[in-house]
Amino acid sequence: MRVLKYMLLYILYLKSIVKILRRLNNMAGSNIIIGIDLGTTNSCVAVMENGKSKILETPEGKRTIPSVVAFKDNEIIVGDVAKRQMVTNKNTISSIKRLMGTDKTVEVNGKKYTPEQISAQILSYIKKCAEEKLGQTITKAVITVPAYFNDAERNATKNAGKIAGLEVERIINEPTAAALAYGMDKSKTEHKVLVYDLGGGTFDVSILEIADGTFEVLSTSGDNHLGGDDWDQKIINWIVEEVKKNDKVDLSNDKMAMQRLKDAAEKAKIDLSGLKEVEISLPFIAMTESGPLNVDLKLTRAKFEDLTRDLLERTIKPVEDALKEAKLSASDIHKVLLVGGSTRMPAVEELVKSKLGKSPDKNINPDEVVAAGAAIQGGVLMGDVKDILLLDVTPLTLSIETMGGVSTPLIKRNSTIPISKSQIFSTAADNQPAVDVHVLQGERQMAADNKSLGRFILDGIEPAPRGVPQIEITFNIDANGILNVKAVDKKTNKEATITIKDSSGLSQEEIDKMIKEAEENKEKDAQLKEQQEIRYKAESLINMFKTSLNGEEGKKVDAKQKEEAEKMINEFETLLKEEKWDELKTKINQFEAMASQFAQAAKQNEEKKEEDKKDSEESKN
């Protein structure tokens, strides 16, 4: 008896310890830094667990999340569900990453949204998925961007994170993240790695040297307007031309038809990575004078590669530029990593092999490796991953405009960051009272040919002949690749500073307002999500039951069972139409039970028929 008493006390003690550990774990949850690959087509999230990066699945068990946002009935839907309704819902937005850092907006139901706001919806969904998987509140993230993203695009990404309720601890380049994931357990051996990163909307090449735990980016190059979407577009254009030629119909002005073509083109591209030929079948794509139009075409891999040869060739120069900047030849590269879903195309692998003389490493998942690397960087920032030092670079030259519209560089492209550089300038006219500091990004000699990042004025300069005042301009790039500029009059010590903001012009007040709106709508969004899930489940059950009733199972049950099933379906359809969510929620279990009973009855009736038939045959014999 005494032993039993002590055992019970010990069990209670263990339970209390578990509770304390859970509480401490939840308290520590805010210190977790997740790694996010915010992609053009798909996104992915990872976290460090037991010294290794782990991809976090969505509640549906998916390891990647389509970067698609849909607006429907005052509800915002993200991911797979949003992608599934792209054909029928015109208020569905994809590839928003291509607009990051611009002043462009997308309009939905008369309201304009910035690229940051749409990206924030994707990040918010990713954050929620991670929280559900880890059972903890997540507030910190490392987010990846294409290596060739400029300052405005990086700031826009950081702002999107803020709106989503994430403290963006670090912005790192996608190829660098991929190399981190690849080389985490190989960092002791010195070797050079070329990362060929072809995503949905961007293309990057980076060369890194890995040695003694240090990952040093030697060079980077790329094209921010080249990606898998462009390969899809080539197929779309081909289908449109084939239909014009064969059926004398132009589909290019039919939005719904074009969306169906987009889906079909993406599928054909993916399928052609494993097949030599695919069939593109699109029934009832449009209505013509002679009736519905069906598209039935065959596309071979050879034809596809011919259609997209110019796109593939556009990836060659960035590879050559990266090698030139790093002062390396192809033979100096030890490993080639292919990153991004678009690198699964056989033509990409063949091109890389022919240009670099070696086969790419196949031990990484091109869709997941970037998120895994971001999680490792998060681990470094948390102090959980030690003995790793990441030395990244700035992708483009940073300069100011000087007399005659000349672009004068302060920090050259592929300089290791963080970095700070200063230079003395002077006035261009006698008694000039102020200087206009125009900050530029790009490789061109003239200011007008480069991207303007921003400008500010340093005034209060004392009267003096031209060339006498000394104005010190300092450029400082932090570890996120974000630029701060300072101008100081050396005589008076008067200074002016600017942190380059993204060209979409979102102020801190606007960002704060968006964060507040997201927080205020949290409960409402959760309710709408639950309703959407109930609707989806109810519709699935109704469709499944109807299929059973009208199919073979329906023939195997008696009239009374069939009548009860039809009654339940009608009741469910009415509740769904009237949006009686609570009643639907409580009755879903009843409906599932009836569906199970229906299937069981059909099975039993079929078995009874078989037995009766067997008995009848035996009695005849």
Swiss-Prot record:
Residues 596-621 are annotated as: Disordered. Pfam families: HSP70. The keyword Chaperone applies. The keyword Nucleotide-binding applies. Induction: By stress conditions e.g. heat shock. Keywords: ATP-binding, Chaperone, Nucleotide-binding, Phosphoprotein, Stress response. The modification Phosphothreonine is found at residue 202. It comes from the Bacteria. Residues 604-621 have a biased composition (Basic and acidic residues). NCBIfam families: PRK00290.1, prok_dnaK. Acts as a chaperone. Belongs to the heat shock protein 70 family. PANTHER family: HEAT SHOCK PROTEIN 70KDA (PTHR19375). This is Chaperone protein DnaK. The gene is dnaK.
